Every structure is written in C-alpha cells, then in structure tokens.
Amino acid sequence: MDRTFVMIKPDGVQRGQVGGIVSRFEAKGLKLVAARFEVLPESRVIEQYQEHLSKPFFPSLKSYIRGGPCFLMVWEGRNVVAIVRKMIGATNPQEAAPGTIRGDFGIDIGRNVIHASDSPESAAREIGIHFKPAELFAYTRVDESVVYEY
C-alpha cells in the first residue's frame, strides 16, 4: 500500500477541525498508520518547507506553522497521495471546491488548514522528516476487503 504525509496546521487544530478531517479520510477507506500532536521545531519546519526557503512569504509561513500544535499523520491506501490531494482541494481555500477540506474549512491562503504530500516522493521524504519507522503501525482494517478489489 502507498503512504502519504498529512498535517493539520495550527488553525485547523485551534478551530477544532481535527476530528472532522480525520473522519473524512477514514470514511473514504484510508488507514491511519501514525499520528501525533506536536509544535514543530524550527529545524523541521525548514526541512518540511525547503522549497519555500527563498520565497518572501517563508518567514510568515514558519511563524504560522510554529504558532501552535499541528496534528501530524501518515495515511495508507492505494493511490493515497492523489486521493488525499483531491480531498483537500486547491491551496487557496477561496478556489477550493465545496466538499473539499479547504473548500469547507479554509478561509485564507495563509491559513489553509492542512498540508498533504504532493507526490509519492514527497510523501516518503516528509514521512521521514516527522516519523521514525517504528512509529508507523501495520494492521488490517476490518473493512479492507470491501474497500479494495483484489
């Protein structure tokens, strides 16, 4: 099975959206294999968002991500990266379709509730930044046989 990294950002945590977001992924049939709340250290924010280091918005992004607890997760499922990206919607909540996480819960591009890996390669890198292999759990959901065609 494929894996992806998902992070509910401080605005999503502080607005009480964790349960609703997790429920959407579970209802889709995805499997949560790791999760924890954490205020990210600066070093991991820099590593996570290395592609944005030279951009003018990076200092405010870093401050925002470090401004409260995030909920870090690893989800598993077939084509999970693409599925989660569709479920979260466009980066700018004002452009995100209704029914997507950002379309329903996001307000501003600078406070867009959630981050998810954009490729399998990014997923592997981001999971490695935030989780040790021993923190990823293997188990079978009781509904896997009806979620996936084998």
Swiss-Prot record:
It catalyses: a 2'-deoxyribonucleoside 5'-diphosphate + ATP = a 2'-deoxyribonucleoside 5'-triphosphate + ADP; a ribonucleoside 5'-diphosphate + ATP = a ribonucleoside 5'-triphosphate + ADP. Its main location: cytoplasm. GO terms for molecular function: ATP binding; metal ion binding; nucleoside diphosphate kinase activity. It comes from the Archaea. It is found in: Cytoplasm. Pfam families: NDK. One of its GO terms (cellular component) is cytoplasm. GO terms for biological process: CTP biosynthetic process; GTP biosynthetic process; UTP biosynthetic process. InterPro entries: NDK-like_dom (IPR034907), NDK-like_dom_sf (IPR036850), Nucleoside_diP_kinase (IPR001564), Nucleoside_diP_kinase_AS (IPR023005). Its EC number is 2.7.4.6. Transmembrane segments: none annotated. ATP binds at residues 9, 57, 85, 91, 102, 112. Major role in the synthesis of nucleoside triphosphates other than ATP. The ATP gamma phosphate is transferred to the NDP beta phosphate via a ping-pong mechanism, using a phosphorylated active-site intermediate. PANTHER family: NUCLEOSIDE DIPHOSPHATE KINASE. NCBIfam families: PRK00668.1 (NF001908). This is Nucleoside diphosphate kinase. It comes from Methanoregula boonei (strain DSM 21154 / JCM 14090 / 6A8).
